[in-house]
């Protein structure tokens, strides 16, 4: 039913089942009442169907350099993680590699923030993010306050496609991961020299970097 997940239970009201006859007889389907749905859901106005899925045990992928990969270094806010997963889905990124310090991709707040994107994006947790990046065999891009202007760095490697690392909300990319970043970038504020916010939200920054790199890859391809 979904690319990366196995459905164990599909709990639905009689009306939902009547409106979706293709699901009739499915072994995972179980009819429940609207009151049952309300008790199980954390939403104020829940949908008439709830799916229970097995949490997948992804293995870290072999990076082939054909598409961008995201790496998250202790991104701890569930809303940020969910938004980043949704961004990845929008830009065709299939894999996110996360350190153990990153929020749980299958926590309720993250799942809600992904708006369904979690079923198409694999989130894999690794014990040693720096070691994994070092052995990936492709360029590693990260954002830093002393990095090169994202829009002026015309010599960024795009083939093979790089891994984009985003760091913790408060402390940024850790020293261990910074040591394996091959290209340091800065998202500039405009106009230059104007007093502005101290920093960008990590999910916003991810969207800016991924959008620019994707634009270049498609322009050059």
Residue ranges of predicted features:
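Structured adenosyl-cofactor binding patch, chiefly the S-adenosyl-L-methionine
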Residues: 51, 87-91, 102-107, 112-119, ...
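Short, acidic/turn-prone active-site loops that include or flank metal/cofactor-
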Residues: 15-17, 34-37, 101-103, 169, ...
């Amino acid at each position: 039913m979904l690319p990366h997940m196995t459905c164990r239970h599909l709990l639905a009201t009689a009306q939902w089942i009547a409106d979706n006859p293709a699901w009739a007889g499915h072994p995972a389907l179980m009819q429940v009442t609207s009151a049952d749905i309300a008790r199980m859901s954390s939403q104020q106005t829940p949908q008439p169907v709830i799916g229970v899925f097995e949490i997948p045990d992804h293995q870290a992928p072999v990076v082939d350099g054909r598409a961008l990969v995201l790496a998250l270094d202790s991104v701890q806010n569930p809303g940020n993680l969910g938004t980043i997963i949704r961004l990845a889905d929008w830009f065709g990124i299939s894999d996110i590699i996360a350190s153990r310090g990153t929020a749980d991709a299958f926590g309720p707040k993250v799942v809600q923030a992904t708006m369904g994107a979690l079923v198409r994006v694999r989130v894999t947790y690794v014990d040693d993010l720096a070691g994994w990046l070092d052995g990936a065999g492709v360029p590693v891009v990260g954002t830093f306050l002393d990095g090169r202007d994202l829009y002026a760095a015309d010599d960024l490697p795009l083939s093979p496609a790089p891994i984009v690392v985003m760091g913790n909300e408060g402390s940024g990319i850790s020293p261990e991961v910074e040591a394996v970043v091959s290209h340091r970038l800065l998202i500039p504020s405009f106009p230059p020299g104007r007093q502005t916010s101290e920093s960008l939200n990590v999910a916003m920054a991810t969207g800016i970097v991924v959008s620019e790199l994707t634009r270049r890859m498609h322009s050059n391809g």
